[in-house]
């Protein structure tokens, strides 16, 4: 009985730790207005890398016809959020 409870507790702690480690890296599809950045060359390509650099992501590639960025945060997902945050423009100051 004690071994079963101990095993259950250890298993749950391991699962929580794995979820925490795996969920650290954010990512997603950057958006230009409400549309994604379309691409045709699946895999790594210069266009998606440039798009991800624009959105302050770490690395980009084409997946399922849209550019996908590793390390993309929620606040930098939309183009206008990035523009307002990083570009100097007297209209937004």
Swiss-Prot record:
Coiled coil: none
Domain comment quoted from the record: Has the structural arrangement of an alpha-helix connected to antiparallel beta-sheets by disulfide bonds (CS-alpha/beta).
UniProt keyword terms in alphabetical order: Disulfide bond, Ion channel impairing toxin, Neurotoxin, Secreted, Signal, Toxin, Voltage-gated sodium channel impairing toxin
Family, per entry: Belongs to the long (4 C-C) scorpion toxin superfamily.
Cystine pairs: 22-87, 39-62, 48-67, 52-69
InterPro entries named among the record's database cross-references: LCN-type_CS_alpha_beta_dom (IPR044062), Scorpion_toxin-like_sf (IPR036574), Scorpion_toxinL/defensin (IPR002061)
Known function: The edited BmKBTx-like may modulate voltage-gated sodium channels (Nav).
Protein source organism: Tityus serrulatus (Brazilian scorpion)
Tissues expressed in: Expressed by the venom gland.
Signal sequence bounds: 1-23
Gene Ontology MF terms in the entry: sodium channel inhibitor activity; toxin activity
LCN-type CS-alpha/beta domain sequence ranges: 26-88
Source superkingdom: Eukaryota
Protein name: Putative sodium channel toxin Ts41
CC per GO annotation: extracellular region
Subcellular location: Secreted
């Amino acid at each position: 009985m004690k071994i079963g409870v101990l095993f259950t507790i250890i298993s749950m702690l391991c699962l929580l730790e794995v979820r925490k480690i795996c969920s650290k890296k954010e990512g997603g599809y950057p958006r230009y207005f409400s549309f994604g950045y379309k691409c045709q060359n699946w895999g790594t390509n210069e266009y998606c890398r440039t798009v991800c650099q624009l959105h302050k992501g770490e690395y980009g590639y084409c997946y399922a016809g849209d550019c996908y960025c590793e390390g993309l945060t929620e606040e930098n997902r939309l183009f206008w959020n990035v523009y307002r945050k990083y570009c100097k423009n007297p209209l937004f100051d």
